Amino acid sequence: DSLTFLDGQNNQISLNDFNGKLILLNFWATWCAPCKEEMPSLDLLQSNKKLDNLKIFPINVGKDNSEKSTVFFKDLKIKNLNPYFDSPKTLAKKFGLRGIPTTILFNKRGEEFARIIGSTDFSDKKFIEWLSSYN
């Protein structure tokens, strides 16, 4: 069962196209303060040399349009990530999200192996060490 979501141009993205990659889905919205707090460290994580096999998809589950999300990223000086969209809320339902931010990690075989509920510091050394063992 393929997991799909949209990019900023309304193109459908399928996680199946990223088999063999370490995948991080981060569910967020522009009105969510903790999401705003963690996004810069998530951005840095995408450019971490130890995690060259990592692909991060920040998926907006709010009612925010692409423009609003782009401005949100620009204001936070996000350079390594692009906003994606869960429209209509398929993934939020599929994963039974209870709140945001929620981060879900998938190994190279596409299996979920971890879930972080609430905001986190993605630049934490222990977290990066742990994650790089899946890279």
Show where each model-derived region lies.
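Short loop/turn microsegments at loop-to-beta-strand junctions
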Residues: 1, 23, 100-101
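N-terminal "domain-start" segment that seeds a small globular fold
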Residues: 1-15
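Short active-site neighborhood of thiol/selenol oxidoreductases, capturing the structured segment around
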Residues: 14-36
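Active-site acidic short loop of glycosyltransferases
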Residues: 18-21, 51, 78-80, 97-98
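Soluble periplasmic/extracytoplasmic beta-strand elements of cell-envelope proteins
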Residues: 26, 58-60, 115-117
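Structural microenvironment flanking redox-active thiols in thiol-disulfide oxidoreductases
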Residues: 36-76, 87-94
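Thiol/disulfide oxidoreductase modules built on the thioredoxin-like
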Residues: 71-79, 86-132
